[in-house]
Amino acid sequence: MQTLKTLFLLLTFSSIFSQENWVSLINNDNLNNWEIKQGSAKFVLENGVISATSILNTPSTYLGTKIKYDDFILEFEVYVDNGLNSGVQFRSSSNYNVPEHSRVYGYQFELDTNENRGWSGGIYDQSRKNFFLYPITRNERGRKAFKNGQWNRARIEAVGNSIKTWINGVQCTNLLDPLSKKGFIALQIHNIADESLVGKMVKWKNIRILTGNLTQYLSESENYATEINNLDNILSDNQLKNNWRFLWDGQTHDGWRGAKLTTFPKSGWIIENNILTVLASDGLESTNGGDIVTSEKFSNFELELDFKISKGANSGIKYFVDTNLNKGLGSSIGLEFQIIDDKNNPDANKKFKVLEYSNGNWNSHKDGIKKNRTVGSLYDLIEAENLNEQRSKRPVHPERWHRARIIVNNGHVEHWLDNIKVLEYNRFSQMFRALVEYSKYSKWENFGQLKSGHILLQDHGDKVSFKNIKIREL
């Protein structure tokens, strides 16, 4: 009996202690601890609820805390009128030397009423990289966690480089990222261009934060919330557990050679600050240092790397490469994840003409643009498209790091660009063989059918950099 009483007192004390550590970010009758960081939409506090109303002719408006926070656990409830997009900034800052619409930058907890996409709880890099660091594309349970037309409970845990989010008790993200260590928290009402959205609202309540003794309050991660690791040259404990390894060690030529050499090229490639760069030359295939390939061959695998293109650049990641093919001029032969500046390289918008032979004459049948040479595409075979959103493929910008991911498993192949799936196919299928028959690869017998092959980084005569090249065999 005494033991039960002691346990009850301990649990009661623990509960009281826990509640006392939390700090409410909503005062009873004012917003004195908040300030407008950007925009001109109105935020109102009434009965413990902060509400913001959407208006035309203003950039996104942010109501931010005056205090900056580094490590914390943040909880809140939120209601978003259908049709609106919103978010909660954290570890964010303001830059007053840029146009107002991009003044606030930093991590954003996405609030998304688009049920076809369902990325609420995802992490967007607002006005900095301007893309999702963690889109909800590999977590179906997380994608369905947010419910339109009701209050939703949200939680953010930001400790060191680890950022995790939950909605209604369902884990949405598991991100490792070093971009921001400290900043304000801000509530967003997104800018609108559609008059039908005028007057719609976003509402928050029960906003509270915990900043001390965080370890004992952190939640266990769920296996369904795939980890995304943006830390340079580091394999996380989770990645090591799942048999990831670096395909390039970041410092030496070990494990790589020239595609048409027995050693690594003596020129044309440089290694600096854990970055592997192919240097610019004449814009032609393999005329400088030449392509490089792995010493090993791979069959079923998941490959991930970060790449950065210079303006107008062209390159590629090839897999199932047979270096005994094409011993002459040009690149080695294999399936290719195209890397290219879609906007500034003409090969991404290469024109074609289809001729039809009839009654002894060749007649023009169709003019068009070969869209299967754009970034992320299976070069000259399948165009990369945005398969996770009802919108066009998100762009790749010169001089910014982007992520390529290739999955190969028993003939099934996927290309991912910045954690968004852009194509999938079966390399042993009838459809694939038909595509090859009408491509530049038709002259290579059984193209793409190898059981295993090398992985290749292409020298196309343009400056392109690579880092964090990692792989796991499936």
Which residues does each predicted region cover?
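Bacterial Sec-dependent N-terminal signal peptides
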Residues: 1-20
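Carbohydrate-interacting regions of secretory-pathway proteins
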Residues: 19-474
